[in-house]
């Protein structure tokens, strides 16, 4: 599994309202199995090429089999349009509400969309992805993706924070500082959705 996201160091506002003193990041992940490859989420407008360059360090982007859209907001999904153009055999994997969003935002043949629910799994060959419905965290189409063999959860925005720093892991940056940023993010974005959040945590 490889992080292929982007750190946006000089972004100073989120949604035109929320100050970003430490910038933000757009987290995308490449999961390479023995048989197939999945890209989990993509990046914000303006960063398509950086995403492609990072993917290319590991595989030919045209060989991607699945683009998993946990969330349809542009900072997660926008570059999916470009990936699907390059990886002509790839399919978009999302929830039923995500399919509705993709049909509005992407120029995509509906036959290329796989709708998943909590009974769905994708076998990549030694790497298995399963899905958790997490509606209203913080849009209605949100899902989490779980990589079973490595026990890694890709929780979309839910455990997020706005950080674009040199360190990659919380203990490198500082656990207390990381927790402070996560609390701020929860208060600013997720607090109105705390009940759906509790429901999602119970499923994990």
Predicted regions and their residues:
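Short, structured coil segments at secondary-structure junctions
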Residues: 86-88, 108-109, 148
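Short, flexible loop segments at the rims of nucleotide/cofactor-binding pockets, characterized by
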Residues: 15-19, 43-45, 69-71, 129-135, ...
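Active-site metal-binding motif and surrounding structural segment of the metallo-beta-lactamase
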Residues: 46-93
